[in-house]
A protein has these predicted regions:
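Adenine-nucleotide phosphate-binding core of ATP-dependent small-molecule kinases
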Residues: 4-8, 15-50
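Glycine-rich phosphate-binding loops at beta-strand->alpha-helix junctions
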Residues: 55-77
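Conserved phosphate-binding/catalytic loops in two-lobed NTP-binding clefts
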Residues: 72-116
Length: 130
């Protein structure tokens, strides 16, 4: 009940609340945010290595779609893998599919909007029709 973001930050299990507290100077919240972003970055790197490279990285869902700070931290220092994002595009993504790739980067980086309610409705319909 008090693990993960809440356990480390002492603030909340919601990353938005943790980021707000970190921005206000809460060191535990900053640590929690840094640890989560590091774990995401480590996982992305592991998958890139396992696949022998990638053509694109997609950020979607709650954090991926709405957290420019997380996207920036995950992609930071990944230039050597061909990943570099445009700061302005990252901070202000436009449309359901937004390419935030920086000019000259070899790997495309996209932010794609999700419609979780639609997915739940489709899955429910599929189950009911079986």
């Amino acid at each position: 009940k008090k693990s993960g973001l809440l356990g480390i930050s002492g603030v909340s299990s919601d990353k938005r609340d943790v980021e707000e507290a970190a921005a206000a100077g809460n060191k535990r919240a900053q640590l929690a945010s840094d640890m989560l972003n590091y774990q995401i970055k480590k996982t992305v790197g592991a998958y890139i290595a396992a696949m022998g490279g990638v053509d694109a990285i997609v950020f979607t869902g709650g954090i991926g779609e709405h957290d420019a700070i997380a996207r920036a931290k995950v992609c930071h220092h990944m230039d050597w893998l061909g990943i570099r994002i445009d700061t302005e595009k990252n901070e202000h993504p436009v449309g359901d599919v937004c390419d935030i790739t920086a000019w000259g980067a070899k790997v495309r980086t996209l932010v794609i909007a999700t419609d979780e309610e639609l997915m739940i409705a489709r899955d429910t319909k599929e189950v009911v029709e079986k």
